[in-house]
Amino acid sequence: MLRDIDSGVSSAWVSSFADDTRVLAGVSTVEGVVALQEDLEKIYQWAAQNNATFNSTKFECLRYGRNKSLINSSKYYSNTLTEIESKPSVRDLGVTMSADGSFADQISNVTTSANLKCWWILRSFITRDRMPLVTQWKSLVQPILEYCCQLWCPNSPGLIQKLEKVQLNYFRKISGMSDLDYWDQLKRLNMYSLQRRRERYIVIYVWKILEAKVPNFGIEAVASSRSGRYCRVPLLKTTAASSTRTIRFRSMGVNGLRLFNAVPQHIRNMSNCSVETFKGALDKYLKQVTDEPRVPGLIKYCSRGSNSSVDQ
């Protein structure tokens, strides 16, 4: 049984899904490198005892951190005693994770796949009427752009615009939309921007965590008679590199909690109800919050004209 694959593992976290196994550990010293290799050896022993095999040619190692000397000097070995190759990015369950933590490769892959799907739709259907093209967009393209978006997020204005331009270019092909500004297109089609949709989904996901409908990854909820239920947002270390702070700030563990706290109290306090009921109340509120930057159009710096619900 795969459920006991982590038996004897002391310093790492082991996860298995289908025929893939992942081993995660925080390593900051040479002793940590040795401990992680020992945990790998225990997993290899478990595989031998249970007549399981690992394909050493598919072993990949992704390393995060600023300690380049430790990263460059440490080596890990597979069950065949071959060195496990370090990769700048690794694809896991459809999400590409990069060593710099930016998810730029993931967004590049997502936008490429979404654009190919858009071109296929526009080549396959002669009509440019609103209803069929919007239906195709919602059914075939949106799932590509929003897959597992609670994990990855654009952490720079350029990446945000790269995603939005997929929707912008597609909506331009709809009859009567080519001469309209992007935000006017969204209003005419009664659609959200992709940034607003990601934020909406993250708020719903945080609510599911608080309602114990999905696993909790460390969110701490606080309730008071004056402020209602809200999430305690962890502080960012001022000693960390600016790029690290940006990535951390954009993550669900920080920005997701800020988004949830920005929702009105009566929505945050909703409990013991269905997900659809919460979605209905949230959508009713979001219709009152403008989904348009203070500077019209696709802007260069989102800080000057953000359409985030937190900044409204």
What is each residue range found by the language model?
Residues 38, 53-89:
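Short, conserved micro-motifs composed of acidic
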Residues 1-24:
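Active-site palm subdomain of RNA-directed nucleic acid polymerases
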